[in-house]
Amino acid sequence: MNNIIILKKYAFSYLSKYNTSKKNLDRILHNKVRRMKLNKKDKYTLYSSIASIITGLEINKLIDDKNFTQSKIHSLSLQGKSKISIISYFVQKGIEKNLIEESFENLELKNPNWEKESAKIFARKKRLGIKYSANFEKDLAKMARAGFSYNLSKKILES
Protein backbone atom coordinates (compact mmCIF):
# COMPACT_ATOMS: atom_id res chain seq x y z
CA MET A 1 0.00 0.00 0.00
CA ASN A 2 2.83 2.36 0.86
CA ASN A 3 4.47 1.67 -2.49
CA ILE A 4 1.27 2.62 -4.33
CA ILE A 5 1.34 6.02 -2.62
CA ILE A 6 4.99 6.44 -3.63
CA LEU A 7 4.07 5.58 -7.22
CA LYS A 8 1.19 8.12 -7.18
CA LYS A 9 3.53 10.80 -5.85
CA TYR A 10 6.01 9.97 -8.60
CA ALA A 11 3.25 10.31 -11.21
CA PHE A 12 2.19 13.68 -9.75
CA SER A 13 5.75 14.97 -9.69
CA TYR A 14 6.30 13.84 -13.29
CA LEU A 15 3.08 15.52 -14.42
CA SER A 16 4.05 18.72 -12.63
CA LYS A 17 7.18 18.87 -14.80
CA TYR A 18 5.99 17.43 -18.12
CA ASN A 19 2.81 17.25 -20.18
CA THR A 20 2.47 13.67 -21.37
CA SER A 21 0.11 11.08 -22.83
CA LYS A 22 -1.52 8.15 -21.03
CA LYS A 23 0.59 5.56 -22.80
CA ASN A 24 3.83 7.42 -22.12
CA LEU A 25 2.99 7.84 -18.42
CA ASP A 26 2.18 4.13 -18.28
CA ARG A 27 5.62 3.36 -19.73
CA ILE A 28 7.33 5.72 -17.28
CA LEU A 29 5.54 4.22 -14.27
CA HIS A 30 6.39 0.69 -15.44
CA ASN A 31 10.05 1.71 -15.66
CA LYS A 32 9.86 3.20 -12.17
CA VAL A 33 8.44 -0.03 -10.74
CA ARG A 34 11.09 -2.03 -12.58
CA ARG A 35 13.84 0.08 -10.96
CA MET A 36 12.39 -0.28 -7.45
CA LYS A 37 14.11 -2.82 -5.25
CA LEU A 38 11.11 -4.94 -4.31
CA ASN A 39 10.24 -8.61 -4.42
CA LYS A 40 8.25 -9.99 -7.35
CA LYS A 41 4.93 -10.09 -5.52
CA ASP A 42 5.09 -6.40 -4.62
CA LYS A 43 6.13 -5.47 -8.15
CA TYR A 44 3.16 -7.33 -9.62
CA THR A 45 0.75 -5.52 -7.30
CA LEU A 46 2.31 -2.22 -8.35
CA TYR A 47 2.08 -3.15 -12.03
CA SER A 48 -1.62 -3.90 -11.59
CA SER A 49 -2.21 -0.60 -9.74
CA ILE A 50 -0.70 1.51 -12.55
CA ALA A 51 -3.91 1.34 -14.60
CA SER A 52 -6.02 2.58 -11.69
CA ILE A 53 -3.56 5.41 -11.02
CA ILE A 54 -3.74 6.53 -14.65
CA THR A 55 -7.55 6.37 -14.76
CA GLY A 56 -7.68 8.43 -11.57
CA LEU A 57 -5.41 11.04 -13.12
CA GLU A 58 -7.53 11.02 -16.26
CA ILE A 59 -10.75 11.52 -14.29
CA ASN A 60 -9.17 14.49 -12.50
CA LYS A 61 -8.18 15.94 -15.91
CA LEU A 62 -4.45 15.79 -15.17
CA ILE A 63 -3.88 13.67 -18.29
CA ASP A 64 -5.68 14.56 -21.51
CA ASP A 65 -4.39 13.09 -24.77
CA LYS A 66 -6.42 15.50 -26.92
CA ASN A 67 -5.03 18.56 -25.15
CA PHE A 68 -1.54 17.05 -25.27
CA THR A 69 -1.67 16.47 -29.04
CA GLN A 70 -3.00 19.93 -29.84
CA SER A 71 -0.42 21.73 -27.72
CA LYS A 72 2.43 19.56 -29.01
CA ILE A 73 1.42 20.00 -32.65
CA HIS A 74 1.43 23.75 -32.16
CA SER A 75 4.82 23.82 -30.43
CA LEU A 76 6.48 21.35 -32.82
CA SER A 77 5.25 23.24 -35.87
CA LEU A 78 6.77 26.41 -34.43
CA GLN A 79 10.06 24.52 -34.06
CA GLY A 80 10.13 23.74 -37.78
CA LYS A 81 8.98 20.11 -37.72
CA SER A 82 7.17 18.51 -40.65
CA LYS A 83 3.85 16.69 -40.50
CA ILE A 84 5.59 13.34 -40.93
CA SER A 85 8.02 13.93 -38.06
CA ILE A 86 5.19 15.13 -35.79
CA ILE A 87 3.15 12.02 -36.58
CA SER A 88 6.12 9.76 -35.81
CA TYR A 89 6.62 11.61 -32.50
CA PHE A 90 2.99 10.94 -31.54
CA VAL A 91 3.15 7.30 -32.55
CA GLN A 92 6.20 6.95 -30.32
CA LYS A 93 4.25 8.52 -27.45
CA GLY A 94 1.33 6.12 -27.96
CA ILE A 95 -1.30 8.53 -29.26
CA GLU A 96 -4.14 7.00 -31.32
CA LYS A 97 -4.18 7.65 -35.07
CA ASN A 98 -7.70 9.10 -35.14
CA LEU A 99 -6.79 11.63 -32.44
CA ILE A 100 -3.69 12.66 -34.39
CA GLU A 101 -5.71 13.12 -37.59
CA GLU A 102 -8.38 15.11 -35.75
CA SER A 103 -5.76 17.43 -34.26
CA PHE A 104 -4.17 17.99 -37.67
CA GLU A 105 -7.59 18.79 -39.16
CA ASN A 106 -8.12 21.41 -36.44
CA LEU A 107 -4.71 22.90 -37.19
CA GLU A 108 -5.44 22.97 -40.93
CA LEU A 109 -8.67 24.87 -40.25
CA LYS A 110 -6.91 27.43 -38.06
CA ASN A 111 -3.81 27.85 -40.20
CA PRO A 112 -3.85 26.22 -43.65
CA ASN A 113 -0.25 27.28 -44.42
CA TRP A 114 1.28 25.89 -41.23
CA GLU A 115 3.50 23.35 -43.00
CA LYS A 116 4.93 25.99 -45.32
CA GLU A 117 5.69 28.23 -42.33
CA SER A 118 7.24 25.28 -40.53
CA ALA A 119 9.44 24.53 -43.56
CA LYS A 120 10.58 28.16 -43.64
CA ILE A 121 11.52 27.94 -39.96
CA PHE A 122 13.43 24.69 -40.59
CA ALA A 123 15.32 26.20 -43.55
CA ARG A 124 16.21 29.31 -41.56
CA LYS A 125 17.40 27.31 -38.53
CA LYS A 126 19.53 24.97 -40.66
CA ARG A 127 20.75 27.80 -42.92
CA LEU A 128 19.40 26.24 -46.09
CA GLY A 129 18.66 27.95 -49.37
CA ILE A 130 20.27 30.17 -51.98
CA LYS A 131 21.28 32.81 -49.41
CA TYR A 132 23.40 30.46 -47.33
CA SER A 133 24.50 27.56 -49.49
CA ALA A 134 25.40 26.96 -53.10
CA ASN A 135 24.69 23.23 -52.94
CA PHE A 136 20.97 23.01 -53.73
CA GLU A 137 20.81 19.19 -53.85
CA LYS A 138 22.26 18.78 -50.35
CA ASP A 139 19.80 21.30 -48.95
CA LEU A 140 16.95 19.53 -50.72
CA ALA A 141 18.08 16.20 -49.27
CA LYS A 142 18.21 17.67 -45.77
CA MET A 143 14.65 18.97 -46.14
CA ALA A 144 13.51 15.56 -47.43
CA ARG A 145 15.09 13.77 -44.46
CA ALA A 146 13.22 16.15 -42.17
CA GLY A 147 9.96 14.98 -43.77
CA PHE A 148 9.02 17.87 -46.04
CA SER A 149 7.66 17.16 -49.53
CA TYR A 150 9.78 17.74 -52.63
CA ASN A 151 7.59 20.53 -54.02
CA LEU A 152 7.41 22.39 -50.72
CA SER A 153 11.16 22.03 -50.17
CA LYS A 154 11.90 23.30 -53.66
CA LYS A 155 9.67 26.37 -53.16
CA ILE A 156 11.23 27.21 -49.80
CA LEU A 157 14.82 26.76 -50.97
CA GLU A 158 14.34 28.84 -54.12
CA SER A 159 12.82 31.78 -52.26
Regions found by a protein language model. Give the residues of each.
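An alpha-helical, amphipathic repeat domain used for nucleic-acid recognition
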Residues: M1-S159
